[in-house]
A protein has these predicted regions:
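Structural core segment of the AMP-binding/adenylate-forming
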Residues: 10, 50-51, 78-156
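Conserved pre-ATP/AMP-binding loop-to-beta segment of ANL
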Residues: 19-20, 148-183, 190
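Conserved AMP-binding/adenylate-forming core of the ANL superfamily
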Residues: 3, 20-52, 57-74, 91-96, ...
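Conserved S/T- and glycine-rich ATP-binding loop of Class I adenylate-forming
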Residues: 59, 76, 107, 178, ...
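Short amphipathic alpha-helical/adjacent loop interface patches that line ligand
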Residues: 41, 45, 198, 205
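Conserved AMP-binding A3 loop
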Residues: 33-35, 170-171, 179-203
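Short hydrophobic alpha-helical segments of the AMP-binding
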Residues: 69-77, 83, 201
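Surface-exposed loop/turn positions
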Residues: 57, 81, 176-177
Length: 207
């Protein structure tokens, strides 16, 4: 593994190498192969790019463990944005506080969280995306709305003759570059964000 230069390079090579193998399975649900994961990641990258999401912007994810949660996480990391995972069990006010404190631009939510949070409590968010199907719960950005409505057409225009392994090209990360802000459970007050660089994620894989 030490011959692979970065975390995202490892993800990229794993997807290409295992293109037709099973990657993610939901309990009593569907199985995604690596090429399915790659396709979903690429669609989210197109959505981010056309919504003016820049590398280094923060994107939060809050939902139960699922293949769609994993896809969103990987899409954020491999785009070069900073992922802010939020525990699904947190109360709405904790979620609001973390989104605001982290200055997240977008928020992915699962089915339960979507019904509990109050978008008006997170005024700087540009959009909330529903994890099960990547539909928009709310959009405050015309570019985000347009990109989501035309996402399939944008994908087809970019890849008119199928999406293939050679199209998988991810953000080249630096070991010291910020990858994730992980918030604690906040047992002594408000949750505190721990800033994790890419080398921390790579260290977990290498271990």
């Amino acid at each position: 593994m030490n011959s692979i230069p970065s975390f995202n390079s490892y993800i990229e090579r794993s997807i290409i190498k295992n293109w037709h193998l099973d990657a993610l399975t939901d309990y009593k649900g569907a199985t995604l192969q690596y090429h399915d994961v790659a396709r979903k990641i690429e669609k989210l990258h197109i959505l981010f790019e056309n919504s003016d999401v820049k590398k280094g912007d923060k994107i939060a994810v809050c939902g139960r463990n699922s293949s769609q949660w994993a896809v969103a996480f990987l899409a954020i990391i491999t785009y070069g944005a900073i992922v802010v995972p939020i525990q699904n069990e947190f109360k709405p006010e904790q979620i609001h506080n973390i989104v605001n404190h982290s200055e997240s631009k977008l928020l992915f939510v699962g089915d339960v969280v979507a019904t509990e949070i109050t978008p008006d409590e997170m005024p700087t968010l540009e959009g909330i995306i529903y994890l099960p199907d990547n539909s928009l719960v709310i959009s405050r950005s015309e570019k985000l709305t347009y990109a989501r409505e035309h996402l399939n057409a944008m994908f087809g225009h970019k890849y008119p003759k199928y999406f293939r392994p050679e199209h998988v090209k991810y953000h080249v990360d630096d070991p010291e570059e910020l990858a994730m802000i992980n918030y604690t459970s906040g047992t002594t007050g408000f949750s505190k964000g721990v800033m994790l660089p890419y080398r921390a994620l790579w260290g977990n894989l290498d271990y």
